[in-house]
């Protein structure tokens, strides 16, 4: 079988599946519903910032423990507090996104 035959079979199968799914993808809600979900997606961007912040905190703690192993317990406790503060922003972003999806 030639490559063109494989491609023809693939395209026929792809478009047959696509034609059966397209009616299900038709617009069934208002623009407000879409904007609400878009706002929830924008709100969840705050989670990425919290992840970057926690990564920076962990990196700094590992570097500090590597330079001064005797201070490991104090550095670890400070790192956990800083990670908790960074995580609070992610929790707030998640709460806002959930409120936008289910309440607004």
Swiss-Prot record:
Annotated localization: Cell membrane
UniProt xrefs under CDD domains: ATP-synt_Fo_c_NaATPase
Annotated transmembrane regions: 37-57, 83-103
Coiled coil: none
A molecular function (GO) term: lipid binding
Keywords: ATP synthesis, Cell membrane, CF(0), Hydrogen ion transport, Ion transport, Lipid-binding, Membrane, Transmembrane, Transmembrane helix, Transport
Keyword Transmembrane helix part of the UniProt annotation: yes
UniProt site positions, description: Reversibly protonated during proton transport: 87
Similarity comment text for this entry: Belongs to the ATPase C chain family.
Subunit structure: F-type ATPases have 2 components, F(1) - the catalytic core - and F(0) - the membrane proton channel. F(1) has five subunits: alpha(3), beta(3), gamma(1), delta(1), epsilon(1). F(0) has three main subunits: a(1), b(2) and c(10-14). The alpha and beta chains form an alternating ring which encloses part of the gamma chain. F(1) is attached to F(0) by a central stalk formed by the gamma and epsilon chains, while a peripheral stalk is formed by the delta and b chains.
Record protein name field: ATP synthase subunit c
Source organism of this protein record: Mesoplasma florum (strain ATCC 33453 / NBRC 100688 / NCTC 11704 / L1)
Gene name of the record: atpE
């Amino acid at each position: 079988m030639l490559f063109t035959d494989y491609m023809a079979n693939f395209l026929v199968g792809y478009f047959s599946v696509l034609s059966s799914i397209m009616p299900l993808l038709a617009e069934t809600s208002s623009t407000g519903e879409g904007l609400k979900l878009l706002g929830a997606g924008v709100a969840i961007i705050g989670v990425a910032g919290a992840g970057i912040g926690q990564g920076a905190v962990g990196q700094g703690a590992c570097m500090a423990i590597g330079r001064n192993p005797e201070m490991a317990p104090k550095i670890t406790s400070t790192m956990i507090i800083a990670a908790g503060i960074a995580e609070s922003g992610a929790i707030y972003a998640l709460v806002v996104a959930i409120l936008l999806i289910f309440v607004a």
